[in-house]
Amino acid sequence: MNFQYLVKIVAGSYYNISSSILSKIINSVIMAGLYYGFLTALALKTSYILLIHAMVRENPNHKAAAITGLILGQLGQLLSIYYAPLYIAFGRPYTLTVLTLIYFLVNLFGNNLDKNASSFGAYGNTIRNLEILCIFLNNLILQLLNTCIFPSSTLARVVNVYLFRCNNKMVFLISSFSAWLIGQILVLMCCQLVLGRGQNKNSIRSLIQKYLVRNSMFFLVVNCLFGSSLFILTIQSLGRIPLPIPTQKLSEISRIEKREEERLKKSGVAKEGKSTEDEEDLSHEKDSLKKEPYSKLENEDEEIEKDIEQAIGTLLFDYKRWTRPFRYIKNNQFEQAVRNEMSQYFFATQQSDGKSRICFTYPVNLSMFWKGISFLSRDKNYSNKLNRHWVERNKKKLKSLKRDLVNRIKNLDKTLKIEFGTTRTRLCTCIHDDETKQEYVPEEYDPLLAGGYRGRIKKEQAILQKQENETLTHPLDTLIDVLENNTNAQLFKTNPIDNQKINFEEELRKKVPRWSYKLITELEQISYYRNPPDDHDIRTRKAKSLVVFDPSKHPNMETMEDNGNIQNNSSDKTINPQNNLTNLKPRTSENDPDDNTTEKEPKDDKSYSIRYSHQSDFRHGLIKDSMRSLRRKIVIKDLFKGNVHSPLFFERRKKKNLFSFSGLVKLKKLFIPGSAQKEFGDLKDSNKKLTIKDKKQQETKERIEIAEAWDSFELTQVLRGVLLVTQSSLRRDILLPSLIIIKNLGRILLFQSSELSDDFKELAKETHVPCTYNGVPLGEKEFPRNWLTEGIQIKILSPFCLKPWNEEKKPLPASENFCFLTIWGQETDQIFGRPRRRPSFFKPFLTKLDTTLKKINLFQFFKEKRTPESNMVKEQKVDDLSDNILNEFQFSKREKLEAITNRTSIIKTKLETIAEEKKKVTRDLDRSLSKKSLKRIRFKLVSNLFPFQSFLKLFIQEIYNLFLRNILLISGLLKKILNREKEKLINQSCSKNEKMKKVHKKFNFSLNRKSKPSTNFSNLSQAYVFYKISQQIASFSVCKLRSILNQQVKAIFVKPEIKEFFARHGLIQTQEMDKKSIQLRTPQWKHWLRVNSQHHLSQILWFSFGAKKENWRKKINRCNKQSLQKRNSSGNSNLDDSKNRNTDNLILNKNQKDNFEKCYRYDVLSSKFIKFEKKKISFIHRSPLSLTRQHQISYHKNMSQNFLFALPKNMSVKNLMGKSQRMHIPYIEKDFDRKYLSFENIEFSLKKKINIESWIPLTSRGNKTKTYNYEFLDELELMEFIDQIYKKEKELLFPCIERNNKIRNAKSKYSFIDWMGLNEELLKHPVTNLELWFFPEFVSLLNIYKLKPWVLQSQLLFSKLTFNKLLSKQQNQTTTKMNTETKNKQKSKVENEKNKKTENQQNAETKNKQKSKTENEGNKETENQQNDESEDDPQLAYIRSFMKKHLLFQLRGESIFKKSGFKNIQILCLLLRLMNQNEMLFSSIQRQKLNLHIMPEIGIKELTLEVLEEIGVPEFLKEKRVNFEPFPLYINKNGKFLMYQLLNMSLVHNIKYPTNNESRNQGVITTQKNNNMASHIPENILSSRRRRELRILMCLNHNKKKCESTEATNKSFIYKKKCAKIWEEQKSTIEFFIWPNSRFEDLTCMNRYWFYTNNGSRFSMLRIFMYLPLKNY
């Protein structure tokens, strides 16, 4: 144990000794010097860049020069830390300028050294030595500039502090220097070690040699980067330090007289002619300046003497004085301001270890404030308990106190006769500065009695006593001068004042250094009394001067020249701190010398109001040309900051809002009145705590914040001014007059007298006066200057208030009868205040109504009936108790208590009995009422019967309506039952005859009972209509029946029910039926809708008739019984039964000579199904064709003209070959002039986009309408040039991928009808919004077109159709000789056309090189064909050119083609019926409904049966069951064609269409030539995103093709080859189109252009240069 104890003691002592030694070593001067030396060596890290650069180049001379320059530069920086003149000399602007110029010169010479070395010849060695010198100076100057580039004075301050505190300064300097040297050596060794290790490895060395040393570009890049970074950092450092330009010094004492003399000379007055007041002012200024001990004149003499003793550095660089102060602390009691030569921090004494030591403390202001607080603070300073010295000292004090206490106690025990008195030392003060008379300080303020840490506040002197002291102590120099110059001075010699000896006790004063000049602000310059200076020296906030009063605009007013008037009208300076207003006017003296000598200049008598904008102004109070580096660090967090804060006090500031971004809160305050209160909580809680004064302060604060917010943002004043003016005009001219008119109309309707004249008289009293932004009113029609930018207020005098009736009231005084207008049209009492509450218009009316209603007691009955009937027993008991309640005011307190106790007991008993009775009462008793309650209810019902009559009437009316509805429903059910029975009777009568039974089945038009009928007939899809029609046609054959029924003899034996049935469906018509038929009432609008079909009206107008169509449908359903019975007679079958019917009956007899046309059949049957009723049922008339009786069906021209489902699947088609008289059938009864096409049934999928041509040309509205003259030829005549057309156009056709339609049901027999799935729900096939998403420029044109369309009439296009010629030609071409002759002619024509093609193509290439080859071929072919054929037959030439451009004939068979081919046939049939075929064609191809790959290719010149047999055409062609139908040619959707079309658009001015005299006379549809070629550029046509997508997709996908198909053949390979040829031929043109018109000089700008990131702010960065095209085409 002892050993362990000894070990612990030894270890503890060793630890204490070692820790003390280590602490001494660490706190020693040597360690501190080593620490700061290493810091100075390693702090400047950027200076080693050039050293590493020299080491890498492996040149020993360069390496040595770099190291020496680095060490010398570091040494200079180290010495500048310890020597203040050197430190400031390196920071002076002049030294920086010299060093930077030398550095730039060295770099410039070093960079151009290699280029100029060859020209020197023999002086090459000296040049190389100069290169070494450049490297040395580079490293040296960079070290000296490093403190300026990266300024940080922390290290220098810390070193200065330690030098000030330590005693052994030389030891500190030596240790720091040695540490710096060791640090430099370590840095150099580390650099050599890293570079040497890398050089030893061959791989690293080879890489360095390959990419760095041998690569000259690397050094050039490094030099450029280093030079640019150095230049930027140098400019940044110049922003922190003053410019090295001599600033203009301010005027001092010697220049005051010169300034005055110059001004007097300008005014034409000699120096002798000065007034006495000016001399006094100058002498006063001179005396005040001469009295300053540190004025510049005296300092110059003293400095000349001291300059000899100062060092050379201090001579060159004056580091103690600058030309300008940063802040100018003004003092109005002195002429010049005090110079603040103290630094930001200073040294003060603080207690440390019980001793006062000098420490590095806080600023001076805080130390002075701390002294003032500590003098009166009562908190005791507790000593440091860890300090042993202070602990021992306190213990000694306690021991001494204990001894004294013990001694006193012992002395008290001694019995001594002497009375001891307690002697106390007290503090006393002299009475009235008399040392003989003293008085004690009060005990509460005496520190000797009450203890330490107490003080006494010094009593201030009275005001009169202060004035007496000031008169005695003030110097009487001016009074003595007056007495000396006065002749009557002898009268004062006997004055007793001379005999008195006035002793002036000079107080202890410190001579404060002052500036030798007086600086003024801009406001002082304006308000200067006389001779204002040329310019102000102190910056002020930017102010806006507003003219308040201009006397020139008021000529009737007298000019106010008197001083009294001037002083009354415009004061010198009035400032309103709340509104930041300053009213200023330049003052003039009474005895101005200019008034006597010179002419009177025009005085500016305008009264101005200066307003300061709420903006961050950190330059406020700064002196011009002062050094900004003296500014302390500031922190700016908010968007708008009026006052800056230091980092020390920034977090302690009061946060105004909950948001860090205060601009959002200010924006909220602009538009929402009273929103500033809602920043920290609810208004209710805050308003309860606030007093009236606090509320007023809060309101003023809010108003100031709103005003500042309006003035902070840009363009807010413009917005606010416009809103105020518009609100003023709306209020005065529109709103209030309209309200007055409405009020008086209401009064007239209520049979009261109108008050129109009185209201308008009161409205005329309301005047709107424009005011300045601060509320200064101007004239009624006079707006302030620049009111849009500087702001405006509108003041309303005697505002108008609308009342239900006018009452005479006392008028308010003019001081109260006004308000200000807000941007929302409301009224406020103050500017930017809360809107005041206006008296409600209905309030007096409602109060009067309330008083009248209270007298009537209308609601008494309803109040009694609140409780349900089941609780009537409880209610009765409570009512009985309520009658016995005592009145509290009739009894005393004792009686009240007794009554309360009795009442509580009674209530308890009653409640118990009620609960028991409630259990016993049954449901029957609950429903029954007592006699008493029934009497009450009867009485109340009788009393309230009169006001309740209106309610009863309404109730009875509702019951009546319900009764009628039920009756109608019952009658409808009865009608249905009767109809069913009648249908059964008809079925029984028809069952005898099998034929009649078939007829009954076939004409079953009734819908499924479960299916709901369509409410809008105009929106029915054609697929659904044709589905019902196909069922109707498949049920019977009308061929034999119509001829029987139309005979009057046989029709007698037919039952009248059957006659009515067939007559209703339009199959027969008799005179008896005509008499018996009920004429349906059709209104005029319905007839108008028939005449004007849906396709002729605007879609906007068409859908507005939806409600009328609904009513029309209801009226149809509510027809007479007979029509309902006849209509519903065939309603027993369902749609499910129709699915099971045999489709074989659809095929008609093949031996029939003539069949109906597809469009003819669909029009008739669809009209019979949907629009069966007519205004006048007409007899059966013949169709335009020469048809038989069995096909005679009524026809209506304006029926639905859609051609989609005109032909069923298995119906035979008439071959029209060789019969030209029926060529016109599809075009006669078609409505070509239809203006609109409903896109509701077309499915557009925008997911798969297709590049198509422009849907609507921009210049379509300005086209002139002309006519074409076409002739329709026979198919055989047109087939001879089909081959030529197809050969030229088929290259642009590409196969498409067929998409399997999942909507169709393969098992359904009628799947061909619903091939698009149009009758399914719209949720499965949503129709997209066809608002031309790719071309937003056309939306407005589309809407205009809907309202007022511009459509070409078909008569203009087909005006001269010569069908007789065609018939004569067919009759003449019966023989074979004529056929052979025509063949030879056509062959010769084709050969001539080919020869002319080659010639014209060569000519076209020379004329227009920018045209594409495909375009030239197409144009020249049309020219040749028209020129050749115009000689024979010009109309035939027009037809052929038209057919080549727009038509192609597709071979269609019925049994051989697959389903995909039949789909194409259906779509193409629809396209033939449409005028605007492009849109439907594109949509069908987009949805992959139309497959262009299956179109047959016919490579023959003439199609005959012999030729068909030779090429192996199937037998179905021999049977003459082939139909050649035209459809619009679609050109491939690839991007190449789109580029071709866009190029064609851009080259419209170069295209020359062939014309001749006949075509000019007949007229051709042409487009106006657009001279503005910029509109054809894709950037101008397309939207911003779409044009970017278009270019990128075309560039990426122009070589991609979709040739995959289930039915792909070897033809796809041919198509690819031909497309490749087109691509090679048009490659130059496409590249020209893809390449933009403007190229950018760098890649970043190119990326910014393609990805649309160049907005307005970045557009200035772009460098755009227009180039010529790549080639000349």
Curated annotation (Swiss-Prot):
Q: Does the keyword Transmembrane apply?
A: yes
What topology does it adopt in the membrane?
A: Multi-pass membrane protein
Q: Which GO terms describe its biological process?
A: protein transport
Please note every region of biased composition (Basic and acidic residues): 264-276, 283-298, 597-611, 1380-1399, 1406-1423
Q: Where are the transmembrane segments?
A: 32-52, 70-90, 93-113, 130-150, 170-190, 218-238
The segments labelled Disordered in the record are 264-302, 547-611, 1120-1146, 1370-1433
Q: Where is the composition biased (Polar residues)?
A: 562-586, 1120-1135
Where located? Plastid, Chloroplast inner membrane
- Signal sequence range: none
Provide ranges: composition bias, Low complexity. Answer: 1370-1379
Protein keywords:
Chloroplast, Membrane, Plastid, Plastid inner membrane, Protein transport, Transmembrane, Transmembrane helix, Transport
What family does the Swiss-Prot or TrEMBL record give for this protein?
Belongs to the TIC214 family.
Q: What does this protein do?
A: Involved in protein precursor import into chloroplasts. May be part of an intermediate translocation complex acting as a protein-conducting channel at the inner envelope.
**Oligomer and partners:** Part of the Tic complex.
- Name this polypeptide is given: Protein TIC 214
The organism encoding this protein is Cuscuta gronovii
Q: Which gene encodes it?
A: TIC214
